[in-house]
């Protein structure tokens, strides 16, 4: 049994004579570079987005995005009468009461390892084609660099969520040989892989239409290298329950023939991204427009097109009230909303909009949220009961059943420009889903400088001045808040809270939150089905 079957527990490729999507005969594939690129490289991009639950890095429900977002102080999924109880799933996420028997967590693990396995498979066959002289050395290096980069990215997400994980790079690895590696070892592997492949990756912009649209290019690798170094204290810690982390100033990387500490490494790779021409867009919303492939800020996206791609974009349509969606032409589900603490961070401290001071409200609030009176194409929306639909951003609780705000409590996700040509359920939009962008790079650079004893004021000022906000001192606390204001709904909040040591704190309305005095919940459990499949696997601490 190979890695795909052993780790994912799914009916993946179980024999090395099977071939990827495309179903070309081996003899034909050996004579065609185009087939190799399509079936062994291009096919892997089908798995970055998704069209079913727990599949895709973003866009689908109950997967990587929800485990990294609904578990935080950023957003929540209140129970609304008969809707969104879902066997207590969302309540478990918000209160950190997940267990090793959570099927959704198991599905997320399987998805991540399915893609890793497919990458290993592609590398195996690319190697075979090289030795049959189908590929030139340049083609071989380019293809393997791209696949290794993708594999490293999926290992990044897997390590970030699950800590000590199996690190398998050989497609022929038998189950009996599969064991977990310490998180620090996986971290160094990912970092070294990205460093090794970066010179062989194209420097083209992955977010722009063209031959490298949506592909893993050099700036994507640089972004991940910066993100890894920024979290080096977390990822170098193999015992996350003892309350002790290594100091980033004493964690070193070999970069450009120099030894740099973690924070210096972050700054180095952020500068590399700048040198490739990435800049902030003049208007924040351009990054999330229907045709956001023109953004000079977006670094890596999931391509979306309601005619060409089956990737789903569930988050907005699951958030909006049914009447709101109906006015747009979508079938929406009235679910997720922002938390009260998020509203407070944006300056919303009074539920009556007529009493608010607009000067105290962050300008990004109006792009990130639907709140107060709902307008569609400038027209007020009827809530279905003869009233104007109004969202109440501060009327939020874990369970709104029976509340006057059961249907309209909480500010809802906006962020992306409304695409009125999307499919009826609002999922197949033309806005590309943004995974990595340059504003994050500036905030990473600012944070690294502060952690290294310097000033990150210039970088933080760039981000805030773009949205015409007042200057704030670039302290660590202010940078964490700025990351919420800038990156709301983008899937980074869990990662940020863990790095700042705040993930286990009691968020607003978490009345049933688990008490975690050791930090064990900063890593998710290995699910029971995975443990039973492979007796070499060991459960993470605390579960």
Predicted regions and their residues:
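Long, intrinsically disordered, low-complexity segments
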Residues: 15-16, 112-115, 189-191, 212, ...
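Short, surface-exposed recognition loops and adjoining beta-strand edges that mediate ligand/DNA contacts
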Residues: 27, 55-78, 168-171, 201-220, ...
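Conserved, well-structured interaction surfaces
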Residues: 34-56, 80-162, 174-210, 410-433, ...
